[in-house]
């Protein structure tokens, strides 16, 4: 029985306008579009009246938008029939938790009503264009009436196995299958398979060919990096991979794992890892070695086809790599990067942005940068990993490179996803897989998506059918991955009792690659049952079940002895799992299929020796010739400094990147010390990202990026050397110490096979693997390659192509001794007399080849910057380390893209100050000024105190780089950036002017992607020369610990009592599936003297936990159930409509000796429990931000007079706080309701601007809530809800900016201590 229920409007006015604009662009005759959600319920019996009411309430969620009377062309978009969407599985879980057992399944679609101009009829092609706008054809279907939606719940018989008949068709049958299935097998691999299956005496099955193709794709096996090379007739001694490994052979210090796992591991620091005791669920610090894992991946092919899911699953896959390192570890902080062709922003196309065309199967660079960053950010946000580092480059030009004149660029983009994490020392190495061990799939179900992704990504774009390209893109479900990570966390937290023996993530090739890899790496074979694979698409054929790349999955080996422990953890975390197979002694792979158990031809889809699949497959031999890049001498004779400055600041590579940053959570974990945003004006110019090792430590980790890819169009080796060097100049402002405490990841992107590029790749690898890194004492223990960076197509009968430069992206990971000493580019105006010093590591060279200056004038140049002397680079790094540790440097910024001009202006932007720069000692006259200001030779600029000059000179001299240093200027208070030479001003404009030019890219992209009203408001702020920036005003003593006596009293009592009779007040740190901010919340309450206890909603619903045992309740932030029924609403309804849970919560709220706090998702959840929270009648509903975008900001708030027990004594204080939410807009039912809330005295916190005024203006008010309302309390003050995150900034070092005078505790600790004081 299927029931249809009409839902709320699905699109805001802004989204409708955006859709209409897209229709207009496609010349579709569309006047208007109205869309609303449509819910479909499959019931196993009729609902009662009360159940019907619960279901209706469950499916009423989100913001209040005016309903329309539907009319026009009807299009119903639903998940693809035969599949179960993530929305369906989560909402169905909520329904069951609400007691709706008769609901077999919920599903959701969107009903579109399209009004056409003058009742026009759409042509077939126009219909196809409209359909493409409205749905994702890989995941969704379009129907023309509601009746057709019944097929959503239809199931069909599974597809059958297919044999490839080589017995009668010979090798040609394999050749044909290779083409039809898109396997991307080379001729020698086809021969290999033919020989082996002939020996086995049978025909191969399609599932076996798919599996072989994925496991042996370039993506998975890195054949080019393992190839043997002959260059210009000379056989080379080493493969590319051996040259990379050379760095580890020469310098293995501090490396614990390299080249053999999902990520590399280096030695970290000691600290207190904070997590709950596995037996008692009481949080506590565990002092131990905290080793650092590091990984950087790319997801280029999927991002070119479908940017949002491509980038999302790129981040998700890299996170899984980290979590599956050793026998389980913890991802901590992420990075994201993009290289694309010319952006060509509508109505903002730049003079250098020629349109060279593109094939229809890929999207534009503009589309990639609109959708891709959102996908990467959304996954990190929902998983709960801060993204604190990134890069963005655009390049597309016809240049005279190694193959003569041709178009070089990034039609096949680079989508970089990486990060660092932590792992226990005893978990770095994987354990033995014992014979008979359970081989488990943990995570989401199989779906028919991402088929052939490994093979597809190994081909140059244009070599496969468009349908196969699209089929190879995966789709994301980050909340599922979060659940899986919680399982992994609970396993590693068991220490020696960790039940995981072996773990791999499921990535390219799906289970067909992961399970064979798991058993082969463990020296075992395996026998698997195909139908034990969790499957949401019954109709799939065997090869689709085994080889699809459904995301959020891991494969794990667990012994029988540990299986019960593992299962209990999975059940508590609601993480799906299944025992799919068993490990065998014989290294053989068998997959059975019980569905066809009676059919001998179909019941054993795979029966192969593992060495046929993963053994000595054919090796690649590369015989290549070197080429010379002609280049062109730069003609800049007509270029003015002023025009060059404007163009450089408008080049997306240099321009402001706020639009890529504020969409991503940068504060979750409470351990981020340095994100991209710098200083009181939150300007995105940080050189690196820094995290604390633990919540009780000043030790930490840092990571930085380096890449100079356009240089490779002229000099392969220089480009590679510069990438390594730039990663060092970017990380030099942190307190690392020895250079060998830094380890590198190398990501290589190359158009393999393109004339000159193969020899160039060898030259570049050799340049750093054999030469520069050994000279610096650096190791590259991890990396990845993508060897198909070329796009080909036919246009009007003409063959066209865009080929990327050889692109090496280096990520440096370092161990930080003291995170408090990190120096940023913010010029300080409050440090007395200071000067700026330029450090030039090239000793006066000003080579412009491959520079941004050349690019913005559509040129390339000839001679490029380079690392001319490794000793000078080493001396620079060591000198910086000495200066940073001695706190002699006030501000630091490296010189890179855009040269000295960009470095200085960005520092001025961060410090909101003018500067006077004298280039007399750097420039050789008027004809040299351009090169002086815009060359991209290695170096940096430091701000130092006049009083420290002699001491600093001594340090610079000690490290041999004093002669590389030049005094270049001072700060001014004129809001002017001025460059002079020999007493003459050569370039001058207001800081505000340059700041707004630099901001244009962000402003334009935000205007087209987000609510344009908000984008305009944020841009307007940049014109305010008087803006004081973030500031603080406290009405209490930040250093006073108001509960010190209580904590001492509790400690004495505890010492007198037995270990199991702790008297400290207990606070329930409540989480639901998808919540991700619970650990830092527990740490904040622990700091205030509470016993913080991990409580999952599954504990409440199962009766394992009772709120009667607690003094405090905290509902934490995140994405409960992936916010499928509105932010926090599904969580709330699972309480309201579950009789036992409702009673328990209601009783707790009514107890006068308790307090409750809800933050972010917990705030949204509690706001939906108003029916059972006394005194909350004036609370609003929290809905989508006005910007219609997830907002991660560091915002200023003011504490209001209110009854809140948490804000006692803090009234009138103004201070910054972390904000990270997509649905924080306080929606009241009417103006009268707003007045009632304001008059009730229950508003406890409001957003204010930098002048201290309550504001509704974006971005000071990140969600547009009326009267700046962002926190409320009950009339008795015992229950407080708030959207910002005080728990993430309770440590001063976790604040993106703070006054120098703050100590260990930020002012937000007072809030948690107030809770402790309330309990008494």
UniProtKB/Swiss-Prot annotation:
InterPro entries referenced in this protein's UniProt entry, alphabetically: Class_I_gatase-like, FGAR-AT_N, FGAR-AT_PurM_N-like, PurL_large, PurL_linker, PurM-like_C_dom, PurM-like_C_sf, PurM-like_N_sf
Amino-acid positions noted as binding ATP in the UniProt annotation, renumbered to this chain: 310-321, 686, 896
Segments forming domain Glutamine amidotransferase type-1: 1067-1320
Pfam families assigned to the protein according to its UniProt record, in alphabetical order: AIRS_C, FGAR-AT_linker, FGAR-AT_N, FGAR-AT_PurM_N-like, GATase_5
Catalytic reaction list: N(2)-formyl-N(1)-(5-phospho-beta-D-ribosyl)glycinamide + L-glutamine + ATP + H2O = 2-formamido-N(1)-(5-O-phospho-beta-D-ribosyl)acetamidine + L-glutamate + ADP + phosphate + H(+)
A GO MF term: phosphoribosylformylglycinamidine synthase activity
A GO-annotated cellular component: cytoplasm
Alphabetical keyword list: ATP-binding, Cytoplasm, Glutamine amidotransferase, Ligase, Magnesium, Metal-binding, Nucleotide-binding, Purine biosynthesis
Subcellular location: Cytoplasm
Active site: 1160, 1285, 1287
Pathway where this protein functions: Purine metabolism; IMP biosynthesis via de novo pathway; 5-amino-1-(5-phospho-D-ribosyl)imidazole from N(2)-formyl-N(1)-(5-phospho-D-ribosyl)glycinamide: step 1/2
Xref: SUPFAM superfamilies: Class I glutamine amidotransferase-like, FGAM synthase PurL, linker domain, PurM C-terminal domain-like, PurM N-terminal domain-like, PurS-like
UniProt: Mg(2+) binding residues: 687, 726, 730, 894
Biological process per Gene Ontology, one example term: 'de novo' IMP biosynthetic process
EC number(s) from the headed UniProt entry: 6.3.5.3
Family: In the N-terminal section; belongs to the FGAMS family.
Role summary: Phosphoribosylformylglycinamidine synthase involved in the purines biosynthetic pathway. Catalyzes the ATP-dependent conversion of formylglycinamide ribonucleotide (FGAR) and glutamine to yield formylglycinamidine ribonucleotide (FGAM) and glutamate.
Subunit annotation: Monomer.
Protein name: Phosphoribosylformylglycinamidine synthase
Source lineage: Bacteria, Pseudomonadati, Pseudomonadota, Gammaproteobacteria, Alteromonadales
Gene: purL
């Amino acid at each position: 029985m299927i029931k249809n229920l009409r839902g709320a409007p699905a699109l805001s006015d802004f989204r409708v306008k955006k859709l209409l604009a897209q229709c207009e662009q496609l010349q579709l005759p569309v006047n208007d579009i109205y869309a609303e959600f449509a819910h479909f319920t499959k019931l196993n019996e009729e609902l009662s009246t009360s159940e019907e009411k619960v279901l209706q309430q469950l499916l009423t969620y989100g913001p209040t938008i005016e309903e329309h009377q539907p009319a026009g062309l009807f299009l119903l978009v639903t998940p693809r029939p035969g599949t179960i969407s993530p929305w369906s599985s989560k909402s169905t879980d909520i329904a069951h938790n609400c007691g709706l057992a008769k609901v077999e399944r919920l599903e959701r679609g969107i009903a579109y009503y399209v009004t056409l101009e003058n009742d026009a009829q759409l042509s077939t092609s126009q219909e196809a264009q409209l359909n493409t706008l409205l749905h994702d054809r890989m995941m969704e279907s379009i129907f023309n009436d509601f009746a057709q939606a019944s097929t959503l719940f239809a199931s069909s018989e599974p597809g059958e196995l297919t044999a490839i008949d080589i017995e009668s068709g010979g090798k040609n049958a394999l050749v044909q299958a290779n083409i039809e299935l898109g396997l991307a097998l080379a001729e020698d691999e086809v021969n290999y398979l033919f020989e082996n299956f002939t020996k086995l005496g049978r025909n191969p099955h399609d599932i076996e060919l798919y599996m072989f193709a994925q496991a042996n794709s370039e993506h998975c096996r890195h054949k080019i990096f393992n190839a043997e090379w002959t260059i210009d007739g000379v056989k080379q001694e080493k493969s590319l991979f051996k040259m990379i490994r050379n760095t580890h052979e020469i310098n293995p210090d501090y490396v614990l794992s390299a080249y053999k796992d999902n990520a590399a591991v280096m030695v970290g620091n000691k600290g207190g890892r904070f997590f709950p005791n596995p037996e008692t669920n009481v949080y506590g610090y565990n002092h131990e070695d905290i080793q650092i894992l590091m990984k950087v991946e790319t997801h280029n092919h999927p991002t070119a086809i479908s940017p949002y899911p491509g980038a999302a699953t790129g981040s998700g896959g890299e996170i899984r790599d980290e979590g599956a390192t050793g026998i389980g570890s913890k991802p901590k902080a992420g990075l994201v990067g993009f290289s694309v062709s010319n952006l060509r922003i509508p109505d903002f196309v730049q003079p250098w942005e020629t349109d060279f065309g593109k094939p229809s199967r890929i999207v534009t660079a503009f589309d990639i940068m609109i959708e891709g960053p959102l996908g990467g950010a959304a996954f990190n946000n929902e998983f709960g990993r801060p993204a604190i580092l990134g890069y963005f480059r655009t390049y597309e030009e016809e240049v005279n490179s190694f193959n003569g004149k041709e178009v070089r660029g990034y039609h096949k983009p680079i989508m970089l996803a990486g990060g660092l994490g932590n792992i226990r020392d005893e978990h770095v190495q994987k354990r033995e897989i014992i014979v008979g061990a359970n081989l488990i799939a943990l995570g989401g179900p199989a779906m028919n998506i991402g088929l052939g992704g490994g093979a597809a990504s190994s081909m140059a774009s244009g070599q496969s059918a468009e349908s196969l390209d699209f089929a190879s893109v995966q789709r994301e479900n980050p909340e599922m991955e979060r659940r899986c990570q919680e399982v992994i966390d609970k396993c590693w937290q068991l220490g020696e009792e960790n039940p995981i023996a072996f773990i791999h993530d499921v990535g390219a090739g799906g289970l067909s690659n992961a399970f064979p890899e798991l058993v082969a790496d463990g020296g075992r074979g395996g026998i698997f049952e195909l139908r034990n694979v969790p499957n949401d698409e019954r109709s799939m054929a065997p090869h689709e079940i085994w080889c699809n790349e459904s995301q959020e999955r891991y494969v794990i080996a667990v012994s029988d002895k540990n299986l019960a422990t593992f299962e209990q953890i999975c059940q508590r975390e609601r993480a799906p799992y299944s025992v799919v197979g068993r490990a065998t002694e014989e290294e053989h792979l068998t997959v059975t299929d019980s569905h066809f158990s009676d059919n001998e031809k179909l019941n054993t889809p795979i029966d192969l020796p593992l060495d046929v699949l993963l053994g000595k497959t054919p090796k690649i031999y590369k015989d290549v010739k070197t080429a010379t890049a002609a280049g062109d001498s730069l003609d800049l004779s007509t270029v003015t400094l002023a025009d060059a400055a404007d163009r450089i600041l408008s080049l997306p590579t240099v321009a402001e990147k706020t639009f890529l940053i504020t969409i991503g959570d940068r504060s979750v974990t409470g351990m981020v010390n340095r994100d991209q945003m710098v200083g009181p004006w939150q300007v995105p110019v940080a050189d690196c990202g820094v995290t604390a090792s633990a919540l009780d430590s000043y030790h930490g980790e840092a990571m930085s990026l380096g890449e100079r890819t356009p240089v490779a169009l002229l000099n392969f080796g220089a480009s590679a050397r510069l990438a390594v060097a730039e990663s060092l100049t970017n990380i030099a402002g942190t307190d690392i110490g020895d250079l060998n405490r830094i380890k590198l990841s190398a990501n290589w992107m190359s158009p393999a096979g393109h004339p000159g590029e193969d020899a160039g790749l060898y030259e570049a690898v050799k340049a750093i693997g054999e030469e520069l890194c050994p000279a610096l004492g650096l190791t590259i223990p991890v990396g990845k390659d993508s060897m198909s960076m070329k796009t080909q197509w036919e246009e009007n009968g003409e063959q066209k192509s865009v080929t990327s430069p050889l692109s090496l992206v280096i990520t440096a990971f370092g161990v930080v001794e003291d995170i408090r000493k990190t120096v940023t580019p913010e010029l300080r105006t409050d440090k007395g007399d200071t000067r700026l010093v330029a450090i030039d590591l090239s000793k006066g060279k000003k080579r412009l080849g491959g520079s941004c200056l050349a690019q913005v004038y559509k040129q390339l140049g000839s001679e490029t910057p380079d690392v001319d002397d490794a000793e000078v680079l080493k001396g620079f790094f060591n000198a910086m380390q000495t200066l940073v540790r001695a706190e002699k440097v006030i501000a630091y910024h490296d010189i890179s893209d855009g040269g000295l001009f960009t470095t200085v202006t960005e520092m001025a932007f961060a410090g909101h100050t003018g500067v006077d720069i004298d280039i007399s000692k750097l420039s050789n006259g008027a004809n040299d000024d351009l090169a002086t200001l815009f060359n991209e030779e290695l170096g940096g600029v430091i701000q130092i105190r006049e009083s420290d000059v002699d001491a600093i000179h001594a340090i610079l001299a000690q490290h041999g780089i004093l002669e590389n240093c030049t005094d270049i200027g001072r700060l001014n208070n004129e809001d002017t950036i001025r460059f002079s030479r020999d007493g003459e001003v050569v370039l001058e404009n207001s800081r505000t002017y340059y700041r707004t030019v630099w901001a244009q890219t962000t402003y334009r992209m935000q205007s087209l992607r987000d609510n344009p009203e908000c984008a305009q408001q944020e841009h307007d702020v940049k014109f305010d020369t008087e803006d004081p920036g973030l500031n603080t005003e406290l009405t209490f003593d930040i250093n006073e610990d108001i509960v010190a006596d209580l904590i001492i009293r509790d400690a004495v009592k505890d010492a007198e009592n037995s270990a199991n009779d702790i008297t400290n007040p207990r606070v329930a740190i409540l989480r639901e599936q998808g919540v991700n901010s619970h650990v830092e919340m527990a740490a904040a309450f622990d700091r205030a003297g509470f016993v913080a206890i991990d409580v999952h909603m599954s504990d409440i619903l199962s009766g394992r936990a009772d709120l009667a045992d607690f003094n405090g309740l905290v509902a934490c932030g995140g994405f409960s159930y992936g916010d499928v029924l509105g932010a926090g609403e599904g969580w709330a309804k699972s309480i309201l409509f579950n009789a036992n849970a409702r009673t328990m919560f209601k009783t707790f709220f009514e107890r006068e000796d308790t307090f409750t706090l809800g933050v972010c998702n917990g705030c949204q959840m509690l706001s939906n429990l108003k029916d059972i929270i006394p005194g909350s009648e004036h609370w609003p509903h929290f809905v989508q931000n006005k910007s219609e975008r997830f907002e991660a900001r560091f915002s200023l708030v003011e504490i209001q007079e209110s009854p809140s027990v948490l804000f006692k004594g803090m009234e009138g204080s103004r201070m910054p706080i972390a904000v990270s939410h997509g649905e924080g807009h306080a929606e009241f039912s009417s103006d009268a309701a707003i007045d009632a809330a304001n008059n009730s005295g229950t508003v406890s916190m409001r957003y204010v601007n930098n002048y201290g005024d309550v504001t509704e203006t974006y971005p000071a008010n990140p969600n547009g809530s009326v009267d700046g309302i962002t926190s409320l309390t009950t009339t008795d003050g015992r229950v407080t809800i708030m959207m910002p995150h005080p728990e993430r900034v309770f440590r001063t070092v976790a604040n993106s900016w703070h006054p120098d005078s703050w100590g260990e505790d930020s002012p937000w600790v007072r809030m948690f201590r107030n809770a402790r004081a309330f309990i008494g």
